[in-house]
């Protein structure tokens, strides 16, 4: 059984990967500003400058693969397909967040 997967580097694939990196960067910059304004409580360790790592690695995952992050997990969650609004709502402590506003930056999870 072969569990490896090759990502085709077509122009469309490359553009999709780039767009995901941009989504992560924009989301993280917004969260950093919100944290400075006191809207995000607790620690908020952003993934700025590391976007390509998650996007490149996660491009090789299957949709049913499970991911556990230990540090700066926002980019991982977004690269795996978490909607940015769910991440932002989570860090704002809202019920509409991926962890119903209870996990925050350090304990993201999506059932």
Q: Predicted segments — roles?
A:
Residues 1-17:
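Charged, compositionally biased N-terminal leader segments and the immediate start
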Residues 12, 35-36:
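Short hydrophobic/aromatic segments of transmembrane alpha-helices and their interfaces
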Residues 19-35:
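N-terminal glycine-rich anion-binding loops that anchor highly charged ligand groups
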């Amino acid at each position: 059984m072969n569990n490896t997967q090759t990502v085709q580097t077509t122009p469309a694939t490359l553009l999709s990967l780039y767009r995901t990196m941009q989504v992560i960067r924009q989301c993280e910059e917004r969260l950093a500003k919100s944290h400075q304004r006191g809207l995000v409580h607790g620690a908020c360790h952003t993934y700025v400058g590391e976007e390509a790592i998650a996007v490149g690695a996660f491009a090789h995952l299957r949709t049913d693969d499970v991911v556990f992050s230990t540090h700066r997990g926002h980019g991982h969650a977004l690269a795996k397909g978490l909607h940015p609004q769910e991440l932002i709502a989570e860090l704002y402590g809202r019920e509409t967040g991926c962890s119903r506003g209870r996990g925050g930056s350090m304990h993201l999870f999506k059932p």
